[in-house]
Amino acid sequence: MKKVAAFLFFQLIVLQAVFCQSAKTVSAKTATVNGHPAWIEQGNIYEVNVRQYTAEGTFNAFAKHLGRLKQMGVQTLWFMPINPISKVDRKGTLGSYYAVSDYTAINPEFGNITDWIRLVKLIHNQGMKVIIDWVPNHTGADNRWLTEHPDFFVKDSTGKAAVMFDWTDTRQLNYKNTVMQDSMIAAMKYWITNTGIDGFRCDVAWNVPGTFWSKCIGQLRKMKNIFMLAEGDSAYLPKSGFDAVYPWHMFHMMEKVAKGERPAFALDSIKNEIDAIYPSNALQMYFTSNHDENSWNKADYGSFRGAVHAPFAVFTQTMPKGVPLIYSGQEEPVLRAIPFFEKDTIVFNKLQRAGFYKTLLSLRKRNAALSPDASFTKVNVGDSTALYAFVRQKAGKKIFVILNLSDKEQTITVHDKSLHGNPYNIFMGTNEPLSNKKWKIEQWGYAVYEYK
């Protein structure tokens, strides 16, 4: 206990010193809307895989892409874990980003703490935000806590630190240990006070107790109005302080609709489930791909193949209570699974989807009808097994979305007179007349109309 107490005292002294040096960064307050940082309300998230993003795989090399990402409309950069990776029981050559050996250090493959602080400042100078991936459920197999604080870990039947699932390169943390909890919170505070980040994406958040999250997030928000994203879809997560969660059920239903296994209107059942289960202000991070789905399940090049991707991407960008995600390389697009444990550089060359994403992200930023709390009304425009159409409205702003979620051309009729007129087609860049006259929409087609 003396060793633990000394360790915590040292951490406190370090954090206080850093806090004093970085008080201007930490004390900066941002507006809150619906319980969330205002900047995320009509924002978006772009997941950065530093290892694979450039040939160098460093912070400094990634920084060269900031201008391009800013121009595309990216607002929040989520960096996959930037901590050192354990060498014991390492998987593959480079190991899993999620087997952390030291919570308050930088992966030397990416650079050093000076490089990271410089990158955060560059991102902030571009008007963007930074969140980092955090791994609170488990550590790497040679994390320093294993020797310094063996009581921080769950024990298996042999008395050794336990392994969860097939994650043999990790060791399971024990959340019954309150000293461990305080140490975890102290480590998270380090990144806010020392580097000025704007929040965390928390890995396997669903396996960490809500009581911890309430305590942790409460303390962190006394320092800065941060954004908190949970990997998980349990209702207790937003109730414990998280701003956003993963809508896994919606993602899997999207996959089924894309394969023709379920009708388009099946998406409504998941939306209704979300409305019923979560607090009214809870945000959903909608996506067509992320690092897990790409590496292990062929997203989006396999699950939303070719032209199938676009209408579902529009869906993720325009749904209520949503914050859309774009994963590294989707704007190219990368048409392969990016390895999890080996080097496989993404080549940015054609950027075939960049204009498509820019159009959507620009609309989200400028139009209040895509605020999380803007109204959502389904619209009948034809065959509901194939067509998914809806209107979003807020503060006199209105967006009309039509998606053909099928591999066949469909006939559309807009009966609602309130939608008639000459709205702006954001993808065509022109105003188009809408009436009750029938018209065709191609397979996997999409249209988004902005009423001004």
Segments the model singles out, each with a brief description of its role:
Residues 78-92, 133-142, 203-209, 232-236, ...:
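Short, solvent-exposed turn/loop segments enriched in Gly/Ser/Thr/Pro and often Arg
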Residues 24-29, 33, 193, 203-287, ...:
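Active-site-proximal helices and loops of the catalytic beta/alpha 8
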Residues 20-42, 46-78, 84, 117, ...:
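Carbohydrate-interacting/catalytic domains
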Residues 26-46, 51-75, 81-195, 213-222, ...:
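Substrate-binding/active-site clefts of carbohydrate-active enzymes
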Residues 131-132, 201, 229, 287-288, ...:
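Generic enzyme active-site microenvironment
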Residues 74, 196-197, 242, 321:
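A structural motif
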Residues 1-25:
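Bacterial Sec-dependent N-terminal signal peptides
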Residues 279-304:
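Active-site clefts of carbohydrate-active enzymes
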